């Protein structure tokens, strides 16, 4: 049966499908709750109420119950070019969205409705990619792609969730991505190539919310992206690419990894075919025992 995802910005490979999956943090009880072979679905968030996930497909935002029922689109008005960087407010009432075409941030009620622009207009290019929200719901953390073509830089910022001035937390030439607040608000977790000795060698880090006190959390030869902290603040799940990977592309043999919040050990949860879209945003369940991701297996 064809899926309802009629808008498509990126195509699956021949024989490939998108599998929205829930798994225990120890790698057990893997449950595919949605599988489609005609569309790319990406980047689940788990609603704080625990009953459903939200994800993006074809520039739109969708929701589905954790048992795989109740698939429906969340109305976002005139913004329908949404990428896979979105977060939910701690109270579960609002979803904050990154729109690809204009590079701006918006908020929409979780039930759907008219979007409200959160981000600012800039005299020079400043494309917003959203990743985190403070535990009190007042501040968003994001990366901005800044500068003209050929001189682009990716740095970390915060902005009030209700709109207001951007606050720069990094001003560097190497890539940074995925800034996400810890549940106690004391840290921002992120990925960076700040210590790379070869192109693309991103690792996991954390820093204080003012940009100080940077600590490295992974020291792998592999390429590690998007550390997502659990709601109880004890563990992170992140995605790990083979050495030599540039950025976080799709259609790669990757691993989902688990580490404690201080990075003192690292363990593989599951290996899969995926990458971009698999786990770009925080997808932990409220109980901190499970999380969601998308795999993209090629079946034939």
Q: What do these predicted ranges mean?
A:
Residues 1-300:
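Sequence signature of WD/YWTD-type beta-propeller architectures
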């Amino acid at each position: 049966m064809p899926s309802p995802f009629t808008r498509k910005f990126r195509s699956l490979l021949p024989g490939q499908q998108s599998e929205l999956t829930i798994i225990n943090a120890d790698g057990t009880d893997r449950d595919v709750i949605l599988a489609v072979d005609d569309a790319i679905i990406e980047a689940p968030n788990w609603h704080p109420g625990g009953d459903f996930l939200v994800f993006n497909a074809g520039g739109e935002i969708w929701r589905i119950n954790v048992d795989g029922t109740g698939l429906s689109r969340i109305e976002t008005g005139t913004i329908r070019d949404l990428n896979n960087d979105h977060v939910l407010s701690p109270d579960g009432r609002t979803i904050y969205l990154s729109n690809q075409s204009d590079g701006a941030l918006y908020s929409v009620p979780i039930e759907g409705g008219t979007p409200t622009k959160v981000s600012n207009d800039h005299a020079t290019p400043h494309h917003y990619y959203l990743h985190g929200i403070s535990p009190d719901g007042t501040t968003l953390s994001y990366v901005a792609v800044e500068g003209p073509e050929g001189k682009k830089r990716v740095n970390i910022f915060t902005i009030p969730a209700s709109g207001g001035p951007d606050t720069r937390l990094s001003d560097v030439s190497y890539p940074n991505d995925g800034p996400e607040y810890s549940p106690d608000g004391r840290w921002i977790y992120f990925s960076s190539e700040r210590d790379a000795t070869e192109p693309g060698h991103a690792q996991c880090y954390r820093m204080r919310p003012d940009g100080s006190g940077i600590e490295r959390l992974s020291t792998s030869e592999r390429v590690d992206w998007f550390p997502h902290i659990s709601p109880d603040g004890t563990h992170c799940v992140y995605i790990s690419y083979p050495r030599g990977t540039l950025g976080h592309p799709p259609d790669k043999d990757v691993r989902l990894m688990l580490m404690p919040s201080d990075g003192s050990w690292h363990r593989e949860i599951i290996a899969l075919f995926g990458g971009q879209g698999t786990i770009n945003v925080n997808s932990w369940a409220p109980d901190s025992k499970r999380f969601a991701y998308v795999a993209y297996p090629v079946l034939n």
